[in-house]
Amino acid sequence: MGYTLWNDQIVKDEEVKIDKEDRGYQFGDGVYEVVKVYNGEMFTVNEHIDRLYASAEKIRITIPYTKDKFHQLLHELVEKNELNTGHIYFQVTRGTSPRAHQFPENTVKPVIIGYTKENPRPLENLEKGVKATFVEDIRWLRCDIKSLNLLGAVLAKQEAHEKGCYEAILHRNNTVTEGSSSNVFGIKDGILYTHPANNMILKGITRDVVIACANEINMPVKEIPFTTHEALKMDELFVTSTTSEITPVIEIDGKLIRDGKVGEWTRKLQKQFETKIPKPLHI
């Protein structure tokens, strides 16, 4: 038996009831976050909460309690479910009202749901690297909002899956934007490249951590777009996300990235990232 965050309470899973006219269910009218938990501790949780509130504000949803209260509820959820290593998923929808495209009256309250899932770190992918495929980016023009509307990403990820690939690397007119569920980085001549954080991508929390790691090891960073052709010519390539951490990409559409092996700079960044992960408590 598990527990779920439901609005401002932690309740048993079976007590949660989602209304058929919840706007998240009918319109994808809401925002969400995923927080990694290592050894019982939430990783970069404040940054995720900040982004949740920012996304909500961009679509004019007011979350009905403070960030500190939200943090407290997530902490209670992790403890209640005795989560060791895994993640928390949580979302905020505009609420429940008779179906109509325009916003409901202000009396309608947002609906908040959160749950935890135990899952190990993707150590094999981190060590050996993965394959990817290029997919045209058909999503909308506000990818900076972490919206529940994920159909474009779902279709891209499915295409990658059917090709036996881990990730779809999205591009608009051959300019790489991001992955279907990740940010994309390339390394050339010791310089780290990634798409600038504008409306074409989600400004990933792990993306920010990786840029900080690069600064800490004196690795130059350039937030400028690069093309699919340039991606294939990179010395190293990797994708980042809350759950995939720094996952090397060794092949795209059958073409090896350099020699098809995980590169030296990627290993350095992984090592630096490792220093930030909460360690087990020894009593």
UniProtKB/Swiss-Prot annotation:
Q: Could you say which EC number(s) this protein's record lists?
A: 2.6.1.21
- State one molecular function term (GO): pyridoxal phosphate binding
Regarding temperature, what does the record state about activity?
Optimum temperature is 60 degrees Celsius.
Location of the active site:
146
Per UniProt, pyridoxal 5'-phosphate binds at 51, 178
Primary enzyme class:
transferase
Q: Show the catalytic activity.
A: D-alanine + 2-oxoglutarate = D-glutamate + pyruvate
Family, per entry: Belongs to the class-IV pyridoxal-phosphate-dependent aminotransferase family.
User: What interactions and quaternary structure are annotated?
Assistant: Homodimer.
| Protein name as it appears in the record | D-alanine aminotransferase
From what organism does this protein derive? Answer: Bacillus sp. (strain YM-1)
